[in-house]
Amino acid sequence: SLKLILCQGLHKPPHTGGAIDWHQDDYYFRIDKMNAVVSCWIAFDQATVDSGCMWVIPGAHTQLWPHESLESPGYRMLGADESKATPLELSAGRFMFHHGATPHRTLANTTDNPRRALAIHYMDATAHTLDGNREAEPPENMPIVRGASAG
């Protein structure tokens, strides 16, 4: 059974900043169970290196890396080997799933076109959010999207 944690519309206008530094979704969501979060990233426009596609560090999802707070909203992950970073370019309408502990980032859009996407984050319905959860939403308010409620 799955609960919806967060659904985000992501928009990178042409020739703008909008880079999101390395992070792991598990760091934000603060779930009491390992391997409980999965995220789906859907490209509405062509997502290329130049337009700010998703980058991942393969194999680095086996641990939760330390993060530091940034002045702007968010965190930056520390310590992972960025030399293995891989861009995941997607055509419009394509999607990718990633584990909640997969380190990922997006860079600025330097093209003449927007780069829009939708990120949908799910968690195991038997898991619970911990105090300090980024969204601070009670689990009972998270809709069940597959299966039955854990109670």
Language model features by range: what are they?
Residues 1-8, 30-33:
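Signature of the catalytic double-stranded beta-helix
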Residues 10, 59-62, 140:
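Short, solvent-exposed aromatic-acidic interface loops
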Residues 69-70, 95-97, 101-151:
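Non-heme Fe(II)/2-oxoglutarate
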Residues 7-9, 40-42, 118-122:
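A structural signal for short, well-ordered beta-strand segments
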Residues 84-97:
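Short acidic-glycine-tyrosine-enriched beta hairpin
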Residues 16-87, 127-135:
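Catalytic core of non-heme Fe(II) oxygenases with the double-stranded beta-helix
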Residues 5-12, 54-57:
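Short, surface-exposed recognition loops or helix-turn segments adjacent to catalytic cores
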Residues 6, 37, 51, 114-117:
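A structure-centric signal for secondary-structure junctions around beta-strands
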